[in-house]
């Protein structure tokens, strides 16, 4: 069953921007799938993400102390606290699955990777977090044979989370205490007559602007972090072009949610974005340019 298709298509870019800025939920009529073993696994990751979000919000309220990594990107105590919480939860529940986590990699800890591994970004959108905006997220994804098969994204400042696995995607409403209050299934929409494009708030490039102009994308909304994937998955936007550097942990969880909702993420050759670690160091974990989108047919 399509989710509020006609209403979504009628939204203007300014109205969408207001809804996004205010964290207004979009109603859907899909029912929640039955819980199976995979769902029970993702519930564990979801709880880890919620716990990490609580730690992040504690730092958010107190005001973050900012330091800088070797690549000059910012890092805060919130990043480090959140990652510790997630790594402990994953090690306790899934000790045999290796984890690639952003802050650990920055400190030189890259585990041996098997066919299955976790990708963790404890705080995606650190710049937005430091600036006092609300579009930062906690991200946990499971990769199997290069494919993001399941993921959870949590936006603690908005009280919203998204999960995706095996063609089932959900949006969760979360209390300020980190408890799940409601959940409903979501689905990406087919491309609207006037498509809405989501653009990185902090990394919009000349190549992105050229793509927008070439494809006649007149309705563009700037959004930070992996929220862009989740908004595509919800069916409130249509396309997210990314032509600047991202790392696998930035995209995997949101990509998993989008794929579970019926969307897709393609590299510039038209192949599904692959999460395959080739080579050594951080460069081996970098993504190529990509385009994420909702349903195309």
Regions found by a protein language model. Give the residues of each.
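Oxyanion/phosphate-interacting regions
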Residues: 25, 30-47, 210-213, 230-297
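Conserved acidic residues
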Residues: 115-117, 149, 218, 238
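Glycine-rich active-site/cofactor-binding loop and its immediate structural neighborhood
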Residues: 118-151
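Acidic beta-strand-loop-alpha-helix segment within the catalytic core
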Residues: 140-230, 277-297
């Amino acid at each position: 069953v399509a989710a509020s298709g006609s209403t979504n298509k009628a939204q203007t870019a300014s109205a969408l921007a207001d809804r996004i800025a205010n964290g207004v939920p979009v109603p859907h009529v899909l029912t929640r799938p039955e819980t199976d073993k995979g769902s029970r696994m993702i519930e564990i990751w979801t709880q880890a993400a919620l716990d990490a979000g609580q730690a992040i919000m504690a730092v958010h309220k107190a005001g973050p102390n900012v330091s800088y990594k070797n690549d000059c990107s910012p890092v805060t105590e919130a990043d480090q606290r959140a990652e510790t919480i997630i790594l402990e939860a994953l090690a306790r529940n899934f000790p045999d699955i290796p984890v690639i986590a952003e802050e650990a990699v920055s400190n030189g800890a890259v585990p041996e990777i098997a066919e299955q591994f976790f990708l963790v970004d404890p705080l995606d959108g650190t710049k937005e977090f430091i600036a006092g905006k609300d579009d930062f997220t906690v991200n946990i994804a499971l990769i199997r044979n290069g494919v993001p098969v399941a993921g959870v994204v949590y936006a603690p400042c908005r009280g919203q989370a998204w999960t995706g696995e095996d063609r089932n995607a959900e949006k969760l409403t979360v209390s300020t205490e980190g408890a799940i209050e409601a959940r409903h299934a979501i689905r990406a929409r087919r491309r609207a007559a006037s498509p809405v494009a989501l653009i990185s708030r902090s990394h919009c490039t000349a190549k992105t602007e050229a793509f927008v102009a070439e494809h006649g994308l007149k309705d563009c909304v700037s959004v930070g972090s992996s929220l862009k994937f989740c908004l595509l998955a919800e069916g409130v936007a249509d396309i997210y072009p990314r032509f600047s550097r991202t790392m696998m942990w930035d995209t995997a969880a949101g990509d998993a949610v989008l794929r579970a909702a019926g969307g897709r993420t393609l590299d510039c050759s038209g192949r599904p974005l692959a999460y395959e670690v080739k080579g050594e160091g951080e460069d081996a974990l970098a993504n190529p340019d990509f385009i994420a989108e909702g349903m195309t047919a």
